A protein has these predicted regions:
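Membrane/wall-proximal cationic-aromatic binding patches
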Residues: 220-260
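Transmembrane and membrane-interface helices of multi-pass
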Residues: 2-234
Length: 260
């Protein structure tokens, strides 16, 4: 079975087998993150069939867009390595290192999303951007609140297992792909990220009247970079407010009391 899978990858993009392995892993992790967060907030999430279908389908396209964007550096590296070097020992270990690093970051992102959701019932947003800006204070609070180093150790070990599985079942080292085909593969690969960058909007995740389902239809990393780019936060969602009429009445009463 392993050889048949590798033969398939060898014939169809074997040089980029590390990319396909990481993309598959990333999509699987995002699926289970979405499912896990939905179950965590089961009392607030709508579990109607049509809403769930929309949530997972729309979420899949957000996940795919993020995964393909994230793989661009590895795709470029795999494309430029000459054929005579591709099967060398140093390149094998370098690619395995890329896979391990990618798997570690994917798992770290999943764990971070859980803790962020636990506190804010939301995917990453502008609050997460502030966390990145005020890194020193945030890291201190995180170290005091969570077992950071044990978590990092577990993530590293799990990433090593994932790397071993991808290496054993998917990675192909002997490929005969000339530079023209490599350039064509790169252009095809980045086509979807380019289309999604200009054609997708974070508003596409608004699939229902339920705020939780809308958040779950999105993708944490997509929302993080969207918040960083747009520099905005839904004030009415994250801060307690009064109806405009009630707030105006209170303000008028205070002005009259002070003689204003």
């Amino acid at each position: 079975m392993t050889e048949k899978i590798k033969e398939l990858f060898s014939n169809y993009g074997g040089r980029f087998s590390a990319v396909w392995g990481l993309v598959i892993f990333w999509l699987a992790v995002d699926f289970f993150v979405r499912l896990g967060l939905a179950l965590y907030s089961a009392s607030q999430v709508s579990f109607s069939l049509w809403t769930l279908v929309k949530m997972f389908v729309v979420g899949f396209f957000f996940d795919l867009s993020v995964a393909l964007h994230g793989m661009i550096p590895l795709v470029l590296y795999l494309a430029i390595v000459p054929r005579k070097w591709f099967d060398r020992s140093w390149n094998r270990w370098l690619v395995r290192g890329f896979v391990w690093l990618g798997a570690s970051l994917i798992l770290f992102g999943a764990v971070s999303e859980y803790f962020f959701w636990e506190e804010f019932q939301s995917r990453f947003n502008f609050i997460a951007v502030d966390y990145l800006v005020y890194t020193t204070e945030v890291l201190k609070n995180i170290r005091e609140s969570y077992p950071v180093f044990p978590l990092i150790g577990v993530i590293g070990l799990l990433a090593a297992v994932v790397t071993w599985l991808i290496d054993r079942y998917l990675l192909v080292w002997k490929t005969e792909v000339n530079w023209k085909k490599r350039v064509g593969a790169v252009l095809l690969f980045i086509l979807f990220p380019v289309i999604s960058f200009f054609g997708m909007s974070g508003n596409y995740k608004n699939i229902s009247d339920n705020m939780y389902n809308d958040e779950l239809a999105g993708n944490g990393l997509y929302e993080l970079f969207s918040a960083f780019r747009n520099n905005e936060l839904d004030y009415h969602r994250f801060y307690r407010t009064l109806p405009d009429a009630e707030a105006e009445a209170i303000l008028r009463a205070q002005l009259e009391k002070s003689g204003g």
